Amino acid sequence: MDWPHSLLFLLAISIFLGPSQPRNTKGKRKGQVRPGPLAPGPHQVPLDLVSRVKPYARMEEYERNLGEMVAQLRNSSEPAKRRCEVNLQLWLSNKRSLSPWGYSINHDPSRIPADLPEARCLCLGCVNPFTMQEDRSMVSVPVFSQVPVRRRLCPPPPRPGPCRHRVVMETIAVGCTC
């Protein structure tokens, strides 16, 4: 049997052995639909279909990673210098860039997390890749991104009551470019 006939034979078998669920005239399955493995039950948290993790688990991990980065910034022995230089021996991309940047801590007590690492450009111009010196004919600008944070919403002082939290997107600088 040559390969076109084999392929046709396999196709016929797969159609014959495939799901034989009867369908009505509109193409929908008859009977009650059973939930699939990703469908939430009465006591299950829905899963994100793309990453198959619980949405709140990602947010907790995100906030934990931000907290670790802020702790590293606070405990850093490197002085907060604003020098425009590229160090190609360093692994960190923010120091190897032609528009290097450093990080500072953006603090807001009415936000969760209260501290966010925010990039600040170390050069006014950009580093020339041939001379490795700052070239002011170009401009170094911050790159902004929106990050999810929770805003603490409390009632005005005359009325005591519990604070609520609302997830909002906040724009912060995450790096610099030429």
From Swiss-Prot:
Arranged from A to Z, the UniProt key words for this protein are: Cytokine, Disulfide bond, Glycoprotein, Secreted, Signal
Q: Which Gene3D superfamilies match?
A: Cystine-knot cytokines (2.10.90.10)
Point out the signal peptide segment.
Answer: 1-22
* GO annotations of cellular component type: extracellular space
Give the region (Disordered) as residue ranges.
Answer: 21-44
Glycosylated residues, per the record, are 75
InterPro entries named among the record's database cross-references: Cystine-knot_cytokine, IL-17_chr, IL-17_fam
The cellular location(s) given in this protein's UniProt record come to: Secreted
Which Cys-Cys disulfides exist here?
121-176, 126-178
Q: Which family does it belong to?
A: Belongs to the IL-17 family.
As for what it does, the entry says:
Stimulates the release of tumor necrosis factor alpha and IL-1-beta from the monocytic cell line THP-1.
**The name this protein goes by in its record:** Interleukin-17B
